[in-house]
């Protein structure tokens, strides 16, 4: 499992894919969202302020808190997203 070192810092949502199944933050970090929370992240808007927390709980050990929307979702850190040119 990849470990994300920039927890407890403010980030913003750069992009979301597949109706909220995965998210990319401004620091190029890529996140797989817990299927039970994908209906929540499907509504999140680009530019929303996100705080990442490491919870160590279950299959999705990170919690993405969307301060803009007042919502949260469980997630897995997938690593850094790199666009193919």
Question: Can you annotate each of these PLM segments?
Answer:
Residues 33-34, 75:
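Short capping micro-motif at the N-terminus of alpha-helices
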Residues 15-31:
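Short, basic/aromatic beta-hairpin or loop at an interaction surface
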Residues 14-17, 45, 57:
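Short solvent-exposed loop/turn micro-motifs enriched in small/polar/acidic residues
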Residues 36-53:
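Short nucleic-acid-contacting surface segments enriched for D/E, G, S/T with interspersed K/R
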Residues 23, 52-55:
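Terminal membrane-proximal soluble interaction domains of membrane-associated proteins
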Residues 55-66, 71:
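Short, Lys/Arg- and Gly-enriched loop/turn segments at beta-strand edges
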Residues 1-18, 79, 83:
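Structural detector for short beta-strands of small beta-barrel domains
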């Amino acid at each position: 499992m990849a470990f994300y070192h920039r927890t407890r810092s403010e980030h913003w949502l750069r992009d979301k894919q597949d109706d909220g199944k995965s998210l990319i933050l401004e620091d190029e970090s890529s996140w797989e969202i817990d299927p039970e929370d994908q209906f929540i992240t499907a509504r999140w808007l680009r530019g929303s302020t996100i705080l990442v927390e490491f919870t160590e709980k279950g299959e999705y050990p990170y919690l993405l808190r969307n301060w803009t929307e007042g919502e949260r979702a469980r997630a897995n850190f997938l690593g850094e997203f790199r666009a193919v040119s």
